[in-house]
């Protein structure tokens, strides 16, 4: 008998051992991940057994992973990484294709198969994660720039939420993770500094010099890095103990890397910390309740059956109150809240049924379809967490009551339908009336007539400084009539262009329009040959005609009018010969759009049977253009006329007006702007490839970058020799033609200067391309363009990156005063970077001229095995003084 008892006890012990010590996996999970970040799946055991009672077993179990019921094999190497004896799977650079069902499979101690499933769902990154991704660790080693700081994946994964929330009195830490590119022999120092400030981006900040630890670790020991690296990994942790309300605010961490070659790079991030002052789990650490809290609750209300009703209870001030809304089910006429009352809403951190965790001072309860059983008395009650106990329902607490009455409104539905129909009818009538008024104003009385006045200091101005000084015209717009109809418009035309036919035409224009529009009186047959001739050249015969006192107005001369979609007409003086008629243009597809307007590709049809059509670009305004847009257009046209022609400056061919809309016809650059061109080569292949007009594939090299730089410098040298400053030189404003030659464009901000130009008006400016004197004093010189050219050099050798990526535009001036400059591009030699730093000298007089820059770039090019560039662009000699007649 005793033996049987021992056997039974032994069997029970073994069964308990098997139950208590058997290996189990945790429950199935739903895992959320963010695009571009690792997806981490953990198949480890739940570790429920006691190691003092159970035999310790080395976990050498096999783990197999499946995706969508298909086993994951070696074909995913590089994309997927298995760590911790294959118990954990990391999928790098997560994307939508990684969504789905995953399963890990292993065996327990009884050699039975067990498994765990994961439902992986991709979510949008938080605003903080999107900010961090801009400087995240590059998955491709070729995108890694030496001497830069990047955020490690751990940094981004830890910021699913934009705000850090810590319970009052708790302990926590703020943690930042860095990857520093470059070997230890190249790095001089790496420093991390923490600050506290009450407002974001505030200059009033306090240095934190305690409870901080910065660690160095081997990058190749980190599981979340998808590749082997040569740099260093750091983490910095700020410890927070017993946090209080005064600790709430913004914590910024700034990392600075200084290289032995003199370059530096910085990376910063700001944490927003909020303190939960109502902590139900530890009521002793909450603030004391104010003696007279204010409760705002619904007033007595009547609602129809099936309508929606919202109960809203708000408590001020926001302190540690437990807020509830009650319904009294025992007696609707008794406004006292009883113990058996039904609690409609209590939340703790989003989990219903336990209480209210005070993240907000407001509690809401809604019923989408009210029924009769919802009628009754409701109460909003607050309880201080500090005094919270199980018998709180039996104590008198601050509360506000309201009565809800529910009624059947079906009998009133007829009047509701009538009222609804009348309201809709009134709205439709108002809309129709508004449209009729708009159409009436547009086609009857809606025109506002303005005249464009273009005044030149001299009657003749020429595109060469050896003939006459180059001066831009003064362009103004004057309203001459408001809300005239079609018949009045015809009378206006007759008044301006047919009366007093014996008066010389030049005097008429002076009388009615002062000086006028940009285009000269000449006729040009459009063909491929004359597109290469300078704009503004007219014959002596035509000049004599225009200056003759006997010139009269032709009775059939058409009036030139611009008209926008706001019913405003801009009257321009009529011209005998526009360079292009609308019929000579075949407009193609849209190739670009910006704040100025829209750019289309087009063909110019030849007037000659033997000449081919010419591909051009057409720049036009948006249909909603206004006075300033017209002025900017005329200024750019005037400036391009004065500039003339140069191999590395985009050419103006002419313009025309089509149904009141202006078209500026310019040279077509098939490869678009330089910035996008470089970025496209960077993203399409590891080594950029371009295709020239001959059909040959060419790889972009440093020699090409030097050629681009020299060509842009030659164009800027030409502008500076003519005392012209561009003011908006950037890679986005340099175009690339079919032969991959550089063409400077966008002269909307360009000005002519003797020594300097001072900007007196506000407007959008290219802050990160501007010199310090432009930012501080609004003074522009040729040396300001030299500074901008240095930024263009940096853009070229970084293949289109944005300058100063870690500095906001409003902080640029202070950064430049502190001596901060763009770091050395990975593709630039030391000699090239020294040239950039010289160009970015604070003193404009110490910066190189464009001629000196060309010489230095040519020397660098020859040192790299290139050939000296041929400067065979069109030169205008001093005896070629082309006059342009302005009426």
From Swiss-Prot:
Broad class of the protein's primary localization = membrane
Those parts of the protein on the Cytoplasmic side are 438-887
> What PROSITE patterns does the database record attribute to this sequence?
IG_LIKE, PROTEIN_KINASE_ATP, PROTEIN_KINASE_DOM, PROTEIN_KINASE_TYR
What CDD domains has UniProt attached to this entry?
A: Ig, PTKc
Extracellular topological domain ranges are 19-416
Instruction: List every position bearing Phosphotyrosine.
Output: 757
Give the catalytic activity: L-tyrosyl-[protein] + ATP = O-phospho-L-tyrosyl-[protein] + ADP + H(+)
Which parts of the sequence belong to the Protein kinase domain? 585-862
Instruction: Give start-end of the signal peptide.
Output: 1-18
Give the Ig-like C2-type domain ranges.
22-115, 180-260, 297-387
Annotated positions binding ATP: 591-599, 619
Glycosylated residues are: 28, 74, 93, 230, 261, 268, 328, 334, 364
Q: What is its EC number?
A: 2.7.10.1
Q: Which tissues is it found in, per the record? A: Expressed in brain, stem cells and the mesenchymal cells.
Indicate the transmembrane segments per the record.
417-437
One Gene Ontology CC term in the entry: plasma membrane
Active-site positions on this chain: 728 (proton acceptor)
Q: Which GO terms describe its biological process?
A: cell surface receptor protein tyrosine kinase signaling pathway
The domain of life is Eukaryota
Q: Where in the cell is it found?
A: Membrane
Entry's family note: Belongs to the protein kinase superfamily. Tyr protein kinase family. Fibroblast growth factor receptor subfamily.
List the protein's name: Fibroblast growth factor receptor 2
Organism this protein belongs to? Dugesia japonica (Planarian)
């Amino acid at each position: 008998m005793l033996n049987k008892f021992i056997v039974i006890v032994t069997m029970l012990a073994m069964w308990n051992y098997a139950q208590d010590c058997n290996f189990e996996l945790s429950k199935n999970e739903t895992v959320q991940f963010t695009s571009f970040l690792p997806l981490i799946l953990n198949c480890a055991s739940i570790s429920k057994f006691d190691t003092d009672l159970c035999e310790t077993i080395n976990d050498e179990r096999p783990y197999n992973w499946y995706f969508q019921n298909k086993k994951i094999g070696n074909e995913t190497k590089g994309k997927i990484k298995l760590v911790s004896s294959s118990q954990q799977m990391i999928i790098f650079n997560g994307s939508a294709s990684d969504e789905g069902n995953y399963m890990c499979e292993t065996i327990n101690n009884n050699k039975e198969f067990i498994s765990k499933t994961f439902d992986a769902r991709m979510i949008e990154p938080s605003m903080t994660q999107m900010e961090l991704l801009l400087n995240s660790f590059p998955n491709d080693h070729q995108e890694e720039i030496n001497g830069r700081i990047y955020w490690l994946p751990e940094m981004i994964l830890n910021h699913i939420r934009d705000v850090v929330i810590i319970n009052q009195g708790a302990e926590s830490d703020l943690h930042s993770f860095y990857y520093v590119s470059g070997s230890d022999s190249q790095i001089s120092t790496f420093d991390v500094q923490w600050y506290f400030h009450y407002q974001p981006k505030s200059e009033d900040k306090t240095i934190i010099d305690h409870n901080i630890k910065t660690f160095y670790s081997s990058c190749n020991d980190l599981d979340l890095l998808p590749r082997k690296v040569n740099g260093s990994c750091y983490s910095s942790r700020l410890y927070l103990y017993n946090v209080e309300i005064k600790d709430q605010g913004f914590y910024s961490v700034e990392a600075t890397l200084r290289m032995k070659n003199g370059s530096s790079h910085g990376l910063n991030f700001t944490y927003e910390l909020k303190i939960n002052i109502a902590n139900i789990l530890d009521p002793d650490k909450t603030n004391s309740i104010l003696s007279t809290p204010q409760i705002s609750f619904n007033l007595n209300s009547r609602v129809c059956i099936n309508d929606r009703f919202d109960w809203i209870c708000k408590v001020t001030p926001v302190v540690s109150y437990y807020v509830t809304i009650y319904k009294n089910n025992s007696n609707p006429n008794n406004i006292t809240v009883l113990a058996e009352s039904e609690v409609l809403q209590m939340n703790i951190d989003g989990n219903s049924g336990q209480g209210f965790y005070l993240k907000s001072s407001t509690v809401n309860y809604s019923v989408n379809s009210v029924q009769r059983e919802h009628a009754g008395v409701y109460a909003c009650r607050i309880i201080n967490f500090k005094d919270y106990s199980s018998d709180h329902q039996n104590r008198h607490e601050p509360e506000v009551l309201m009565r809800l009455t529910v009624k059947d409104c079906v009998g009133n539905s007829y009047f509701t339908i009538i009222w609804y129909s009348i309201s809709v009818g009134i709205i439709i009538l108002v809309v129709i009336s508004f449209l009729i008024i708009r159409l009436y104003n547009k086609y009857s009385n809606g025109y506002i007539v303005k005249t464009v006045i273009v005044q030149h200091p001299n009657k003749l101005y020429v595109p060469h400084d050896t003939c006459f000084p180059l001066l831009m015209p003064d362009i103004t717009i004057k309203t001459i009539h408001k809300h005239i109809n079609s018949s009045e418009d015809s009378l206006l035309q007759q008044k301006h262009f047919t009366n007093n036919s014996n008066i010389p035409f030049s005097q008429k224009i002076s009388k009615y329009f002062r000086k006028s529009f940009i285009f000269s009186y000449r006729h040009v047959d459009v063909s491929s040959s004359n597109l290469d001739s300078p704009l503004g050249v007219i014959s002596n015969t035509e000049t004599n005609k225009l200056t003759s006192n006997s010139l009269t107005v032709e009775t059939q001369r058409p009036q030139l009018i611009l008209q926008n979609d706001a019913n405003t007409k801009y009257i321009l003086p009529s011209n005998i010969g526009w360079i292009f008629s609308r019929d000579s243009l075949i407009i193609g597809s849209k190739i670009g759009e910006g704040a100025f307007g829209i750019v289309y590709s087009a063909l110019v049809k030849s007037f000659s049977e033997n000449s081919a059509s010419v591909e051009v670009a057409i720049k036009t305004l948006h249909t909603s253009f206004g006075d300033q847009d017209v002025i900017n257009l005329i200024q750019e046209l005037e400036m391009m006329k004065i500039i003339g022609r140069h191999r590395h400056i985009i050419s103006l061919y002419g313009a025309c007006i089509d149904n009141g809309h202006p078209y500026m016809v310019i040279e077509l650059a098939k490869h678009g702007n330089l910035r996008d061109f470089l970025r496209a080569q960077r993203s399409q292949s590891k080594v950029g490839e371009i295709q020239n007009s001959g059909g040959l594939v060419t790889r972009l090299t440093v020699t090409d970058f030097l050629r681009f730089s020299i060509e842009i410098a030659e164009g800027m040298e030409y502008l500076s020799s003519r005392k012209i400053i561009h003011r908006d030189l950037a890679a986005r404003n340099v175009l690339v033609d079919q032969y991959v030659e550089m063409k400077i464009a966008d002269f909307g901000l360009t000005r002519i200067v003797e020594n300097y130009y001072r900007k007196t008006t506000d407007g959008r400016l290219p802050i990160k391309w501007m010199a310090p004197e432009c930012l501080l004093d609004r003074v522009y010189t040729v040396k300001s363009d030299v500074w901008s050219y240095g930024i263009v050099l940096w853009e070229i050798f970084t293949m289109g990156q944005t300058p100063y990526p870690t500095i906001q535009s409003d902080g640029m001036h202070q950064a430049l005063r502190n001596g901060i400059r763009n770091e050395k591009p990975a593709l630039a030699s030391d000699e090239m970077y020294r040239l950039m730093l010289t160009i970015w000298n604070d003193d404009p007089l110490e910066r190189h001229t464009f001629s000196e820059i060309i010489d230095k770039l040519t020397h660098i090019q020859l040192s790299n095995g290139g050939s000296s560039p041929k400067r065979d662009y069109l030169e205008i000699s001093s005896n070629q003084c082309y006059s342009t007649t302005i009426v």
